[in-house]
């Protein structure tokens, strides 16, 4: 059986990166919440 986590930095950035978060209203909400919480890293 193939394992579920097959690491790839490209896919990681595309799916969870800053630009993909900024692209949708929900993603911007996520960034705002993480800023409000004082997270050092906002996205992958």
Swiss-Prot record:
Pfam families per record: Ribosomal_L34
Signal peptide: none
Basic residues bias: start-end ranges: 31-44
GO function terms (MF aspect): structural constituent of ribosome
One GO process term, biological-process aspect: translation
InterPro entries with a match to the protein in the record: Ribosomal_bL34, Ribosomal_bL34_CS
Protein name per the record: Large ribosomal subunit protein bL34
Organism: Rhizorhabdus wittichii (strain DSM 6014 / CCUG 31198 / JCM 15750 / NBRC 105917 / EY 4224 / RW1)
Gene name tied to this protein: rpmH
């Amino acid at each position: 059986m193939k394992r579920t986590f097959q690491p790839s930095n490209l896919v990681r950035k595309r799916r969870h990166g800053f630009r993909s978060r900024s692209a949708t209203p929900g993603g911007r909400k996520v960034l705002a919440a993480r800023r409000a919480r004082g997270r050092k890293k906002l996205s992958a």
